[in-house]
């Protein structure tokens, strides 16, 4: 029997929780132009609100480098154009 406390998501607590597209804090404190702080949803026309592959509320174009190569065994990662997150870091042996 687990003792974990599960609480419903709270919009405005700056934690991205289930059902939220963004959470930038209270409407008075929100600094994210892509996020509607009152609803924790992206504003109309926004594709994203944060991430290495998100610029001005839009996904960065496909092929844009988001993580530099660290060595010949660690190629650079590039944005997909379909997500605000940089793909997982992949290394070659």
Swiss-Prot record:
Ca(2+) 1 binds at residues 10, 13, 15, 17, 20, 23. Snake venom zinc metalloprotease that possesses hemorrhagic activity. The disintegrin-like domain has been expressed and named leucurogin. This recombinant disintegrin is able to inhibit collagen-induced platelet aggregation but not ADP- or arachidonic acid-induced platelet aggregation. Furthermore, it inhibits the adhesion of human fibroblasts to collagen type I. It also reduces adhesion and migration of human fibroblasts and inhibits migration and proliferation of human and mouse melanoma cell lines (BLM, and B16-F10-Nex2). Binds 1 zinc ion per subunit. This is Zinc metalloproteinase-disintegrin-like leucurogin. It comes from Bothrops leucurus. Expressed by the venom gland. N-glycosylated. A motif (D/ECD-tripeptide) lies at residues 72-74.
